[in-house]
A protein has these predicted regions:
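N-terminal alpha/beta PP-like core and its mobile active-site loop of ThDP/TPP-dependent enzymes
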Residues: 1-131
Length: 131
């Protein structure tokens, strides 16, 4: 109704419970940003207990699914996820955040030297033109 996305923050163990919500958001064309925790960067790919490829599972259920492996680029990925969730047909997007990055601190302007443009509010694009 408002075209503003909801945010669902899920820990690593709760990802399986978020999958039905992703399917529902996809079916209802609801803009939802799912931020899920995953195993630490050091332990990814080691076959640890409860380690799953959440990005691959969420990919067919969302408009965008990505794992953030560089904490200084969080702003960039969140901005992209927001735009994708609300533009065109609204829908769910998924950001996977390793636990070690999730509990780290980063400067608000981190990574700005790589993308020196200002992040300003933009009107959302419409799925169809004004009548």
């Amino acid at each position: 109704i408002t075209r503003k996305p909801a945010v669902c923050l899920v820990g690593p163990e709760g990802f399986a419970n978020a999958v039905p919500a992703m399917m529902e958001a996809w079916g209802e064309r609801s803009p939802v940003i799912f931020v899920t925790g995953s195993s630490t960067l050091k332990r990814q790919g080691a076959g640890g207990f409860k380690e799953i490829d959440d990005v691959a599972i969420a990919e067919p259920l969302t408009k965008y699914s990505v794992s953030i492996t560089d904490g200084e680029r969080i702003n960039e990925f969140v901005d992209r996820a927001y735009k994708i969730a609300v533009n065109g047909y609204p829908g769910a997007v998924h950001l996977s955040l390793p636990v070690d990055i999730m509990f780290s601190s980063f400067d608000e302007n981190a990574g700005r030297q790589e993308r020196p443009f200002d992040l300003t509010a933009q009107a959302p694009a419409r799925a169809w033109p004004e009548p």
